[in-house]
A protein has these predicted regions:
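Adenine-nucleotide phosphate-binding core of ATP-dependent small-molecule kinases
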Residues: 170-201
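Short beta-strand-loop/turn "lid" adjacent to the catalytic site in phosphate-handling enzymes
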Residues: 26-32, 50-81, 108, 117
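Short glycine-rich, Thr/Ser-proximal phosphate-binding strand/loop in the N-terminal lobe
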Residues: 3-41, 45, 116-119, 123-124
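A short acidic Gly-Thr/Ser loop motif
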Residues: 7-11, 65, 100-104
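Short glycine-aspartate micro-motif
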Residues: 3-7, 57-61, 95-98
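Phosphate/pyrophosphate-binding loops at sites that engage ATP/ADP/AMP, CoA/4′-phosphopantetheine
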Residues: 43-58, 197-205
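Glycine-rich phosphate-binding loop plus the immediately following alpha-helix
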Residues: 28, 113-156
Length: 205
């Protein structure tokens, strides 16, 4: 028997297929998000990799920002619960999970048995999320995947003071116009994310 897990996120859809021996036999990630049928494409890719069809799936669980788009699933589970179960399955003994998604960020504290003890989410729009980093990459004229490499070349630390993504974008544009380097701004963006996540870690206990 095969089991299907689908995560319909705000910026991408992820699929994993597991057999009855608890082995992950196929995965797929499609970067399109909830406004499309990206999860169907991801499922097709995973089915092809595993050499199976939907008829071979015994049970399906869906999670994520857009999980309501897949009502055919046998069960819908929150991202918080899925994070806890997935991390506990892959790495025993983990007590803290940090998830920086496209639209929100979460810090999850686990109990000794791997269940959720507490969690906190970001409070200010897209601040501290993947969307914030996407905006920073766009302003700096690079791909999101290139942002960390750019930050590694910084020669000083700068602070991005605005917590709102819209205002932070304006602040970064002003700094660049004033002569600040893209490398230093990229590092500042990473530091801004890190500080916000660390604040969440403090609140989760």
């Amino acid at each position: 028997m095969m089991y299907l897990g689908v995560d319909i996120g705000s910026s991408s859809s992820k699929v994993a297929i597991m057999n009855d021996r608890d082995e992950i036999v196929a995965t797929s990630v499609v970067n399109l998000g909830t406004g499309s049928n990206a999860y169907e494409t991801a499922m097709d890719e995973a089915f092809e990799t595993a050499g199976i069809t939907s008829a071979d799936i015994a049970y399906t669980v869906v999670t994520g920002y857009g999980r309501v788009r897949f009502p055919e699933a046998d069960k819908q589970i929150t991202e918080i619960t899925c994070h806890a179960k997935g991390v506990s399955f892959l790495m025993k003994g983990i007590r803290t999970i940090i998830d920086i998604g496209g639209q929100d960020a979460k810090v999850i504290k686990l109990k000794d048995d791997g269940s959720v003890e507490n969690f906190v989410m970001n409070e200010k729009c897209a601040a501290g999320t993947g969307r914030f980093m996407e905006v920073m990459a766009r302003v700096l004229g690079c791909e999101l995947s290139e942002l960390s490499g750019l930050a590694d070349k910084a020669d000083k630390e700068i602070s991005i003071s605005n917590v709102c993504t819209v205002f932070a974008e304006s602040e970064v544009i002003s700094r660049l116009a004033a002569g600040e380097t893209s490398e230093n701004v990229a590092r500042g963006a990473h530091l801004a994310i890190a500080k916000r996540v660390m604040g969440m870690c403090g609140r989760v206990g």
